[in-house]
A protein has these predicted regions:
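Acidic (E/D-rich), amphipathic helical modules within compact regulatory domains
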Residues: 30-53
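Short beta-strand-centered segments at strand-helix junctions
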Residues: 24-36, 81-91
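Mature exported/compartmentalized surface modules and terminal targeting/interaction regions
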Residues: 1-7, 11-16, 47-124
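The feature marks the first
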Residues: 2, 18, 27-31
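Short, surface-exposed binding/anchoring microloops in extracellular/periplasmic proteins
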Residues: 21
Protein backbone atom coordinates (compact mmCIF):
# COMPACT_ATOMS: atom_id res chain seq x y z
CA UNK A 1 0.00 0.00 0.00
CA UNK A 2 1.47 3.31 -1.13
CA UNK A 3 0.43 6.30 0.97
CA UNK A 4 0.50 9.77 -0.48
CA UNK A 5 1.98 11.98 2.21
CA UNK A 6 1.87 15.73 1.89
CA UNK A 7 3.57 18.50 3.82
CA UNK A 8 1.24 20.87 5.65
CA UNK A 9 3.52 23.88 5.27
CA UNK A 10 4.70 23.22 1.72
CA UNK A 11 6.84 26.13 0.60
CA UNK A 12 7.92 28.15 3.65
CA UNK A 13 9.66 30.96 1.71
CA UNK A 14 8.00 34.30 2.41
CA UNK A 15 7.39 36.76 -0.39
CA UNK A 16 9.63 39.82 -0.70
CA UNK A 17 7.01 41.79 -2.62
CA UNK A 18 3.33 41.17 -3.33
CA UNK A 19 1.36 42.74 -6.17
CA UNK A 20 -2.46 42.78 -5.97
CA UNK A 21 -5.04 43.29 -8.73
CA UNK A 22 -6.40 46.24 -6.71
CA UNK A 23 -3.10 48.09 -7.28
CA UNK A 24 -1.77 47.55 -3.76
CA UNK A 25 1.89 46.56 -3.41
CA UNK A 26 3.25 45.16 -0.12
CA UNK A 27 7.01 45.47 0.36
CA UNK A 28 8.96 43.36 2.86
CA UNK A 29 11.53 44.74 5.28
CA UNK A 30 14.25 42.95 3.26
CA UNK A 31 13.38 44.89 0.09
CA UNK A 32 13.00 48.14 2.06
CA UNK A 33 16.47 47.65 3.56
CA UNK A 34 18.11 46.88 0.19
CA UNK A 35 16.55 49.98 -1.39
CA UNK A 36 16.94 52.11 1.78
CA UNK A 37 13.28 53.12 1.57
CA UNK A 38 11.81 55.95 3.57
CA UNK A 39 8.33 57.49 3.65
CA UNK A 40 7.52 59.29 0.41
CA UNK A 41 10.02 57.55 -1.89
CA UNK A 42 8.57 56.69 -5.31
CA UNK A 43 9.16 53.20 -6.72
CA UNK A 44 9.23 52.13 -10.34
CA UNK A 45 9.97 48.99 -12.32
CA UNK A 46 12.41 48.90 -15.21
CA UNK A 47 12.32 46.16 -17.85
CA UNK A 48 15.48 44.91 -19.57
CA UNK A 49 14.66 42.13 -22.05
CA UNK A 50 12.71 39.66 -19.86
CA UNK A 51 14.06 40.93 -16.53
CA UNK A 52 12.06 43.20 -14.23
CA UNK A 53 13.95 45.48 -11.82
CA UNK A 54 12.51 47.38 -8.85
CA UNK A 55 14.20 50.68 -8.03
CA UNK A 56 13.61 54.03 -6.31
CA UNK A 57 12.69 56.52 -9.02
CA UNK A 58 12.45 59.55 -6.73
CA UNK A 59 13.61 60.11 -3.15
CA UNK A 60 10.88 61.86 -1.11
CA UNK A 61 9.76 64.34 -3.78
CA UNK A 62 7.29 67.15 -3.14
CA UNK A 63 3.66 66.57 -4.06
CA UNK A 64 1.69 63.40 -4.64
CA UNK A 65 3.03 60.66 -6.88
CA UNK A 66 1.91 57.23 -8.04
CA UNK A 67 3.81 54.41 -6.26
CA UNK A 68 4.82 56.60 -3.29
CA UNK A 69 5.69 54.32 -0.35
CA UNK A 70 4.60 54.59 3.28
CA UNK A 71 5.41 52.40 6.30
CA UNK A 72 2.64 49.98 7.29
CA UNK A 73 3.23 50.44 11.03
CA UNK A 74 5.33 52.55 13.38
CA UNK A 75 7.73 49.84 14.55
CA UNK A 76 8.19 47.69 11.44
CA UNK A 77 10.17 48.21 8.29
CA UNK A 78 7.47 46.97 5.92
CA UNK A 79 6.16 49.42 3.35
CA UNK A 80 3.12 49.67 1.11
CA UNK A 81 2.35 51.61 -2.03
CA UNK A 82 -0.26 51.72 -4.74
CA UNK A 83 0.09 51.60 -8.52
CA UNK A 84 -2.43 49.96 -10.84
CA UNK A 85 -0.01 50.23 -13.76
CA UNK A 86 2.86 48.44 -11.98
CA UNK A 87 0.52 45.73 -10.64
CA UNK A 88 -1.10 45.14 -14.03
CA UNK A 89 2.31 44.76 -15.71
CA UNK A 90 3.57 42.25 -13.11
CA UNK A 91 0.31 40.26 -12.93
CA UNK A 92 0.27 39.95 -16.73
CA UNK A 93 3.90 38.82 -16.77
CA UNK A 94 3.19 36.21 -14.07
CA UNK A 95 -0.11 35.15 -15.68
CA UNK A 96 -1.81 35.76 -12.33
CA UNK A 97 -5.22 37.31 -11.69
CA UNK A 98 -5.68 38.25 -8.01
CA UNK A 99 -2.12 38.57 -6.67
CA UNK A 100 1.52 37.71 -7.33
CA UNK A 101 3.74 36.89 -4.34
CA UNK A 102 7.33 37.18 -5.55
CA UNK A 103 10.94 37.07 -4.40
CA UNK A 104 13.72 39.42 -5.42
CA UNK A 105 17.29 38.58 -6.36
CA UNK A 106 20.57 40.17 -5.31
CA UNK A 107 20.77 43.94 -5.86
CA UNK A 108 22.80 45.43 -8.71
CA UNK A 109 23.76 49.03 -9.41
CA UNK A 110 23.54 51.15 -12.54
CA UNK A 111 23.11 54.84 -13.43
CA UNK A 112 19.60 54.77 -11.89
CA UNK A 113 20.94 53.57 -8.53
CA UNK A 114 20.29 50.24 -6.83
CA UNK A 115 18.15 47.78 -8.80
CA UNK A 116 16.47 44.70 -7.33
CA UNK A 117 15.64 41.97 -9.86
CA UNK A 118 12.08 40.69 -9.38
CA UNK A 119 11.86 36.93 -9.93
CA UNK A 120 8.65 36.73 -11.98
CA UNK A 121 9.09 33.12 -13.09
CA UNK A 122 8.40 31.66 -9.64
CA UNK A 123 5.17 32.52 -7.80
CA UNK A 124 5.05 31.71 -4.09
Amino acid sequence: ILMMMQSILGNTRKADITFYASGRIDISARVAKHLQLSRGDVLDIMIDQDEFYLYVRLRSPNGRHEAMVFPTNKAGNHFRTSSSRLCTAILQECKATAKARLCVGEPTENEYGKLLPIITKYLL
